[in-house]
Every structure is written in structure tokens, then in C-alpha cells.
């Protein structure tokens, strides 16, 4: 950590010091500059033509789904392709009805279907029904085990089946030891055979071993899957063309949204006013695309990205700049939630505090227009909670206090920010985000606790070395090592086991009967997926290296060639 000294004249209400020593994290600057500010709209006639093509192709796909009504395996393959290609949102009703029909006939009535003795077909059946939240039993895989309960050696020759079973295991819930065994079995053997496979199956296996589909971002996974799907002779040309056209139309919408946000962000001039903070509008928007990319959530994205940039800046004020006395003032101001508190703040904090109130006022006006003003209470309360958590961590850092792991997690799950972001993600979702939904969220059900855990544990595992070098508050890794007297490697192993359980809790929380409407549960799952992608190897939000840059470019710069 470096310490910089700042003239006291720029800070109000602190008169006893001539200079203030501040921790500076030296976060890398934004790599994007003004790239996304200007957006050239596509010719209206060309766009209209593409939209007509999309509608025609959608009708063709609907017909294909309908004609396969008595062919479950064919239906499953079409559904799988639409989901992997990122266009399932166009066919939600058709997919829902198809899977319901398959569930009733093949599971409830126990009717055999073509391929019901084939590992690939059974695993695909299981995965797609679990993805649609049906409580199908993993006992369907017993037929692939020998008399001693081990998976049969003959399966090792079926790479396609092993891959599908591997993908299915990531939808497991607590108590499904058979799927735990299946994960170990498939992972081990796929790693052994991948170098002997041909393209495109070899590429599919490599990708899945790195990024299981269930934990990936659907739109990002679609970009990868386009070329894989196209390489198979059996691919559906209508599906592929529809997916590429739709991808480009959505990309245009997202670029337009980002351009609007970039102009707003530049007008705030936070990069100049808060040079110590991470300037990550583009990365933040990428994060939000992982939460929802569909066109009907345009307003929701505009709301959450503005709040996201505010909380990211506030996080860095507490984490990498503010003194304890200054942070106490900011915490009190947030608790009061009153523009009159502005005069009590240090000069450099004022633009941030005012912008927070401005953003919330703008959202409040929108909620009022929708007759949903009650939502603002929850949004404000979550902001107050997370800022209180930042304050607790700042005190620990100032006192060089290393809490117990349990004490740490009681605060760190809040500062992970995922209940906060889930709350904000609901604001622009329309009538489905009822008062009951917000009350349910505030009760911290197991699925939200699990999501918070994934966020916090992955953040700590990937960023604790950088943070300790700069004098950050003790991370969960350090707290765990100190309390239990274990090595860093052992702490990582314990965290990994906690992550496995948390994902099982999330999977369980998504199963029918739904505690809340499915779109609300999907925001929790989607936010958790973002963490798995961005913190896969390291903190790519803070340190925007080539893998992260490439992911952003694939969604927001590079169109699909149709």
C-alpha cells in the first residue's frame, strides 16, 4: 500500500492536521476511454428488414417444436440449441409447454422415450428438466452404474455422453451423492480424453471443463457456441441464422444503452473527481448484461447501472481513500438521506453523495410514474446497510483488527453487495416485483444467502493477495487462516467446499414450487453466474486484462457475421 498526502485545505471540518495520509490502491485506469460514447444508429430500413427476418425465422422454429411434440429427444435437442444460442427468451411459452409435456409423459407416467438407455439422451433430459426447475430424480443414472455402485468403464468411450453428464451434474442439490460421484468421474475422464477428440467436440469439452454451462452467462456462452454449433453437420440452419440476426439486433440495443450511459457518466466527471476509484462503467454494464440482456429489461438495466457505478465509487472511497473520520461523516449522511447533510461532508465526498441522491430521485420519479413508489424504501435501506458494512470494515482496517471468520462473514456478506444489487435489479422489472417479493428478499432466504456466499468467497479467493499488499482489511482467507491455524492452501480448499454447497443451495432455491416468480429467482442466479465468470481466475473487474477485454468486445463491439 502507498500513502499519499493531501493538503488539508481540500477537506472541510478537519482542522487539526496540516496533511492527511491516505491509503491509495493505484487501481488501473479505464482501458476504454470514450470508445462507447458515440453510437452510430443502423439504417432504419435495414433494421426493419432484419426484424422481419427474425419474426419469420421464429415462426419456423415454433413449427419445428410443434411437429416434434411426440418425439421427446428431437424436442430436447431443439430446446437445447435455442438455449445455448441465446434465443430461448423468444420461445419461453413453447419451451415451457414442451418440457411440461415431456416431464408428465416420461417422468410422471414413466413412459420410455427414444434414447432412454443412452447416456447422452438421459443426461440431456435430466439437465433440461432441472434447468426448467423440475424436481426430477438423479436415480435415472443408476442404470449407468455397475453392481458396486461405480459408473461403468464402458462409458469412458462415450465422450459426448460424458460431457452431457458433466454439464448435468452442475444442477445438483444437497444430498445427491450420485451426481457428486458423476462430476468426479466425468471430469477425470474428460480431462484424459480431450486431447484425443476431434473438433468441435474437443473444443466443447475444453470449454466446459473451464466454464460449465450452468455457471456461464447465456449471452457470452452463445457467442462461443455459434461456431461450435455451425461446425456440426446436423445443425439447424434456421436456428443458427435466427440466433445471429437476433444477436446483432440485441447488440445494437446494448450499444445504444451503453452510449447513453457513457455520456451520463462523463457528465459526472467521476474519473477526475475520484481519481483513486475504479473507473469501470463499461465493465459494470457488462456485469449488468449478465443479470439480464433481454430487450424488455432495458429500463431495469438503465436503473441498475447507475446505482452500480455509485456503489463501486463508494466502495473505493471506504476502501482506498477516506480517513476514518471522513467515512463516519459519509456514513451518517447516508443514514440521514438528506441533501442538507451535504455541507457536513469533506469537499471531495460531496459530488458522490449528491449524485447518489440524484440517481435515487430519478429512479423514484420513475417508480412513482409506475405506481411502485414502495420499492424505494427497500432500495434506500439496502444502500444504508451496505454503507454501514463498509464502515465496519474500515474500522477493522484502521484498528488492524482481524475478526473471527464468523464475525467477518456477518459483515462481509453484506458488503459483497449481492442483496443490494438483487434489490436494485428488481426495481425496473414491472409488476412482478411486488411488495411481497421485496419482503421475501429482505428475509434473506437460503438462495440469497448462498448467492452472497459465492460472491464473497470468490472475491476473497481471487483478490486477497492484491488487497493485503495494499493494506486492505483482512479478507476471509486471512481470518480463516488465523482462527483455524491452517495454511492458505487449506483455507482455499475449505472455501471451495463452501462454494460447492452454496451452488447446491442456489439450485435448490430455484426448483419448483417457486417461492417467488421465476424471473425474480433468475436475477439471483444470474448475478451469481457473473461472479463465477468475472472472478474465475482473478478479479477481472479491478484488473481488466485481455480475457475480460475480449469478453466485453464479443458482446459490445464485434457483430456476428450472418
Swiss-Prot record:
An example Gene Ontology biological process: diterpenoid biosynthetic process
Keyword Chaperone: no
GO MF: magnesium ion binding; terpene synthase activity
Cofactor note: Binds 3 Mg(2+) or Mn(2+) ions per subunit.
Cofactor: Mg(2+); Mn(2+)
Residue numbers binding Mg(2+) 2: 315, 319
Superkingdom of source: Eukaryota
SUPFAM superfamilies hit by this protein: Terpenoid cyclases/Protein prenyltransferases, Terpenoid synthases
Keyword Manganese: yes
Residue numbers covered by motif DDXXD motif: 315-319
EC number of the protein: 4.2.3.-
Enzyme class, broadest EC rank: lyase
Binding site for Mg(2+) 1: 315, 319
One Pfam assignment: Terpene_synth
Binding residues annotated for Mg(2+) 3, in chain numbering: 467
UniProt keyword terms in alphabetical order: Lyase, Magnesium, Manganese, Metal-binding
InterPro entries for the chain: Isoprenoid_synthase_dom_sf (IPR008949), Terpene_cyclase-like_1_C (IPR034741), Terpene_cyclase_plant_C1 (IPR044814), Terpene_synth_N (IPR001906), Terpene_synth_N_sf (IPR036965), Terpene_synthase-like (IPR050148), Terpene_synthase_metal-bd (IPR005630), Terpenoid_cyclase/PrenylTrfase (IPR008930)
Family: Belongs to the terpene synthase family. Tpsa subfamily.
Function: Sesquiterpene synthase.
Designated name of the protein: Probable sesquiterpene synthase
The encoding gene: SesquiTPS
